[in-house]
Amino acid sequence: TTLADYDVLSGPIRAAVDQGIDVIIMNSGTPEQARELGALMYVGQPEYDAGLAAGQRAKGDGVASFLCVNHYISSPSSTQRCQGFADGLGVELGNQMIDSGQDPAEIKNRVMAYLSANPDTDAILTLGPTSADPTLLAVEENGMAGDIYFGTFDLGDEIVKGIKAGTIAWGIDQQPFLQAYLPVVVLTNYHRYGVLPGNNINSGPGFVTADGLELVEKYAGEYR
């Protein structure tokens, strides 16, 4: 099961566990919450770890400073993504994360304002299509498209176009196919043979680059 709302779902999940039903938490929620509820394991993308891996990848590409465009700052997972990226780079998050809001025009304006005030920014990290799409428009308008390092969480039509065009270096795919597939495999083997992986399973981050777009497009809406 997913754990989109801990307050709403924790009771029923705990009741199922108490009745001897084996539970695996997938997609939403956290490994800590899964353990607290007595679930066998968690299969998903830990947000901090995904941000950390993205930051380490960017550091390897020469990035030392960045702008994190946070369009849902009230959610702790969003800040974890930005903090992980900063830690991966080995820098302080500080004021490199902005609360962009969710209005596309406002996001575009705030990104352009930040980059105008901080022209030496090496990279941009967006947290999904909501912030990525307006940010694409911003860097196209200010002439930074293709020059500033650009990575994003999640995939979408405009993000895929940006990767194709070379404006976006990569999109992070949490690989929901694995989130649905692996729990079935784990539970089947657990009930048949009594074997269980010793740790949670991270389904992401999977980094989608221009080289990997063919399969993403082929299976979009089906496996991807």
Predicted segment positions?
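Hydrophobic alpha-helical
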Residues: 1-18, 85, 100-162
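Loop/turn elements at helix/coil->beta-strand transitions in domains of secreted/extracellular proteins
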Residues: 18-23, 37-39, 61-65, 90-94, ...
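Hydrophobic alpha-helical segments within soluble ligand-binding/sensing domains
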Residues: 41-66, 105-108, 155-159, 175-192
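Short beta-strand segments enriched in small/hydrophobic residues
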Residues: 3, 40-41, 65-73
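Short beta-strand elements in bilobed, periplasmic/extracellular small-molecule ligand-binding domains
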Residues: 65-68, 85-105
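Hinge/cleft segment of the Venus flytrap/periplasmic-binding protein
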Residues: 88-89, 178-224
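Short, solvent-exposed amphipathic alpha-helices that sit
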Residues: 50-54, 76-94, 110, 134-138, ...
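Flexible loop/hinge segments that line or gate small-molecule binding clefts
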Residues: 11-49, 156-164, 168-169, 217
